[in-house]
Amino acid sequence: MEKLVIVGAGVAGVNAATKLVDNGYPGELITIIDMGKDPYNRKPAEVMEGFLGAGGWSDGKLTYHTAIGGHMSKYCGEEKAMELFDEVITNFKRFHPKPEEVQCSDPQAEPDFIKPYFGLRLFPVWHVGTDYLHEIGKNWYDYLVSKGVHFHWENKVNAINFRHGEITMRSVKPEFANMDDDYVLYDRLIFAVGKSGIDFGKKLSEQYTFPTEPKPVQIGVRFEAPQHHFQKLIDISYDFKLYRKFDNGVSLRSFCTNNNAAYVAVEQTYGDVSYNGHAKKGEQYRNDMTNFGILMEIPGIENPFDWSRELVQKVNKTWIADQGIKGRNAPKIHSGLYYSPSRKVGVTSEGEMIDALPIDSLDPVREAFQGYYSYIDDFIEDMKKVFPTLGDDWGVYVPEVKYLSPEPLVDYDNLTLAEWDEVHFVGDALSARGITVSGAQGIYVAESVLGSWKKHSYLLEQGTGDIF
């Protein structure tokens, strides 16, 4: 029997494991390794690692269109991609404590009032609700454990030997800092790291020199303002995506829009801070705010991953919080920046001040963005024309970033590497940028694994089976 290891317990890896055990694959042959914690021990602030990854700790919105969130249809066609999306959405409903509250918004018509300045991408979105993601995670995790799936939590994979099917990992727990590495052997590997593992995927790409496709830089800000300024558009498209493209190939889009009970969230990746957003379901969380990312896609930059990391480091600062404590004991905060013509830094859904250093001028941000911030300036100015009450009643948290390393070229039938047919890449490791696409890629790979496993089992029954 084949030992399968999944590196990354995010949406892609978890959906893959679920598809496998649902169809009889022995759970005791599946091992999942993740830097984070199980859903019972994962804290709200741990948004990047842990069961269901960043996607399962986000805004709880599942986009339902093949043109959004990364590649799926290019591998399997439109019809199959939508079938896989349905399966991802079904899984979230299946483990949801109140599945009847999962609803779909499906805007149909682009309003005339935005057309002079923006395009509006219209597509269906399933709303799971941030409030329920934790319970979904617990239910889903319990199911996989009940099927025999083994998890290695708080372990970081630092090397993979494709030739010998060997994974090297080490505990990230401080009390085990001096312990030796652990090793796990596999017959088949699903590499399903999230954003916090993109640097490791890049390292593997360079080590094994597998062919890749360059990806553009994706970086910008998290924009926040009172919801009433955008209500006219929200009534048409709840999760609106404004879009602009320029002649030099640079494009901008708003994305991950949160309304009603909308909060800016802090993400920590590679020791630096960036921002995202999420929305709560409960009326007790209502703050009548809207936030969304304004993200630039910049093609043609050499080493886009390194370029993005350097920019993020430039707009991260360590500063002393004004909490009445002086001297060496004064608390220090490492964060990104916050700029607003009129507003103060917001609070989290837990009522705590968002970690962001207020600045009086965007000049240091413009310098760090090396001239590209002018596109965001223009985007905001045009929003003020489309939404005339907006004026100076807004703020931006800097930066928001989607780390993308060069995308490995894979076999379209099973997402395996060209020279390593037992190694599959899925999720952020394959440039997925959304929950639905990540989950769909995981299920797609699982279907391939199941096909091989069932064929192998049949051959064994006939007395002719040997290896996959």
Model-predicted regions and their roles:
Residues 2-66, 106-468:
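Residues forming the flavin
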Residues 50-103:
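Dinucleotide-binding Rossmann-like beta1-alpha1 core, especially the glycine-rich loop
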